[in-house]
């Protein structure tokens, strides 16, 4: 056995009344107990009850002191929100693996103040109140929860848009905030991840949008334009970034080489961590490709400059016209770490005959000149762009705005293989750009040193090459010549890394060799990211690399091994098919009037696309289908005074060694939808008995007993006993285990809890008529028969008869018709009620049997855990050292469950003492 495992005398599985009793009995005998509960609080089902029968004592008043004693006992360790993965029997012990699910709240920091709950915008059905009312996604399970710690109910998935973003931005979060009119909060949420929302709102290719579930219907939510709206709204309000003081300074200095999206984002996150950051930029202006090559009509430079203020307002220095040629020099200047984010500022050339003719330029030179005002005069010229990527399309649309008579993009593969994003191609064609496919230039022809013609050859596609695209193959004899005045080569970009080749290792394509997980170079102080590592990518991909690098650089500077940490808090994307199967989805068309008229926009470099109005932004945000349980809007983070919210938490596997195991996993309730003839789930005024217990409990969700359908106070209530028990005809495999197809035994408690509820309803609704439909009344315990007779004396009606079905009246009242056989007369009758309560039976909860890896935990004929010697040693099971308590062994009321727990604790103590 490994020495680093946690060692206990006993493992108690389940934190209901039986589990607590067993744990306390053992703990009081000075045994160390590990209590594992799958819910967020101990208490089990008893804490949901109104009162207990037959004494009608308050259930919470009985169980909450026991909950407090259990939670505070020095010999009891609680593991909540946890599941048993495996239990493996050894010679004199058990090895246990436990999976503790994340709360996304630091349990040792949370004060239970509920501030997170107050600001959380998302409401979900409240399990504690049996889905009769709502609760927030950030919530404390119930008012009497113990421990009183909040939890963020993410349910293990994120929205597809969040999962898809390479930068870790939370589109669902800011969409929901825009929907609520919280534009500043939307901006702040974006700034938690990436500091250049203005640029992304205009020039991001929005991978989030391509994964939007709404896209499977009429069209995706216009996520990028929503971002553009709130970022511009914020920048209009704050034209200059507010200076943010970082109070905790580390004293570490980091040099960032390059001020593109990767460098800016890395500098931003490092500065937030308290490090001193200086960016070295070789160009005259900061911003990298954002500033130098993206056309003004797509991304105005004022937007880039305002984005950069988000970084410099943290104290980050940017030194332009400063080309770094030696990395060792930075170390000698006192920098503790270096981040290389040089981008891809070199271009590939065709290198064919005539390439040196005047009138042939690279795409980057062409776009840079256009951005700095040194624009080529293309008036009435015929322009060709060679290539099919994003820069090729940018160059083609720029050429149109510079007066070109005809602009043609020539690409050697088919349109499907063009690497440019499809919307950009469509916009270019709308403006008049011609796309010529399956052509390749083989010779430039000129006169007097100036380009005049291009010789092309036609291509066909063959088998896929290393890129996964079909290889273009020349067609013999297909050469032809076209007139041209100006050619822009846009056949690819390559990293600007050659200058560092003597100090760091490069791949053959010029990209930097890094640790793929940490972006560290050979375990040194140097890290690299962005296009210099990945090759040409998108803005958001490069920014995501910068964010990742900052995370690992911070670990390195804190003396930690970066390899020991996992970056990011993404969860798997929710299954879209489940979202699309919802019955409340309506169609909502997007806003299509998004562009300036074509004849206007091709004449200048002003914005092509319009910014949403506030009404348009909200309308677009309303189209969101709310895919995941948690919006990840991080309002809880902002509101928490204790800074306890932690979205980076992950599942934790805990190893334990225990000497004995007590199974007190309780029971399941029959799912009444498996008796469809009773209308549960179809008629809102048909509820189950646990829901009624919540309606009459002191901690009930409403101030009165109300029927769910319309909030009316019911005055004619029916109970149908034995719903899902004493019934061999039900296929209820969904509610039970795969082996359980019916539930022929009596659940023992249904009659009495129904009579209890009837008496409480007589007190809460003195004028109500209450009828209990039954086959037999099982009043077997002490005082139970008297309790039954008392209820009859109070006016509760009892009808001995089997209910066949429940239907709803068609008069709009929501009232219900019960069709039943009155066994006293043998006549089939009907009765009207305005609320029907199904007294559901108890089913075995035997899931724990699957967790024993090398032993078989036997079940009895009804699929409860088998008691080997029910009369002499009622807690013994088929595995030595494993004991059963409470309703895990069969139906029991609360007193019997407590007695059973005492028996299990006693037998476990005897077993432990004899080891």
Specify the residue positions occupied by each region the protein language model found.
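A short, basic/flexible loop-to-alpha-helix module at the beginning of a structural domain
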Residues: 1-8, 147-153, 234-254, 365-381, ...
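Phosphate-coordination loops involved in phosphoryl transfer and adenosine-cofactor binding
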Residues: 7-9, 81, 250-253, 321, ...
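Beta1-alpha1 glycine-rich phosphate/pyrophosphate-binding loop at the start
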Residues: 8-72, 137, 166-180, 187-194, ...
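Non-heme iron-sulfur electron-transfer modules
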Residues: 39-65, 79-109, 121-160, 169-199, ...
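A Rossmann-like FAD-binding core segment of flavoenzymes
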Residues: 65-106, 300-349, 361-379, 401-509, ...
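FAD-site-proximal beta/loop scaffold in flavoenzymes
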Residues: 122, 126-149, 356-381, 464-536, ...
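Short, well-ordered coil/turn residues at beta-beta hairpins
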Residues: 341-342, 386, 490-491, 522-523, ...
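A conserved FAD-binding loop/helix module that cradles the flavin
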Residues: 532-557, 662, 741-752, 885-913
